[in-house]
Amino acid sequence: MRKRVLLAVVAAAATGLTVAPLTASASSHREAPLIAEDPLADNTDLYAFVAPDDPNRTVIVANYVPFENPAGGPNFYRFGDDVAYQIHIDNRGDARDHLVFTFQFHTSTVDASTFLYNTGPIGFNNATRTYTNWNRPQTYRVTMTNADTGSSAVIGSNLLSPPDVVGDRSTGSAQNYHMLARKAEYTLPGGFKVFAGQRDDPFFANLGGVFDLLNFSGATTGAEDYLAGMNVHSIVLSVPSGMLTANGD
């Protein structure tokens, strides 16, 4: 199967960290006509910030699959098996790749006789490290490439992506879902930390007004966030900050 490649670029220079999204035929929050036909490959936003629990680490978040309505059916929201999601790091400020992280996903079907996303309340089996009653689980692998030498190494494989939020009967309360999602957090060799799964979309915008010829006059009660309550699929990569800057500066 020929994989499509989606790029998220993090450029770091000695003067500071600059972050800019760069994608192959993708744009922000589905306003570009072509990528609207391929939401699994739509890179909505890219964020980078100092880890709240460790000032020596930087968290990079690349979001995909915009406008995930929790009531819209979980079958439609996932990472694409035919997409190679990539984060490129320029840590010298020369506009060239030096480190590339590639995330590749695989979806399996537990019971092919049903179309159901889950066949009962989704739980987690600590002994087998698998989610229970989830009929469409996703796993992924992470490959790190040194673009200077051309060498690549798989730094994580058969990693779990958590199930989507379906509802109280399927994924339990918000607290229960939080515990389910935490099972999909990983620390990998080299000090990398990763998570890939559904999250609340943090982007704030009056998109209704934007698409209505920049009509913001109706916002009489203050700012309007048309993305409130919507989710995205996030690829989260935490790295030692020294990897993002020239000479560790």
Model-assigned labels for residue ranges:
Residues 1-9:
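Bacterial N-terminal signal peptides that target proteins for export
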Residues 8-18:
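Bacterial N-terminal signal peptides
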Residues 22-249:
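Surface-exposed extracytoplasmic segments
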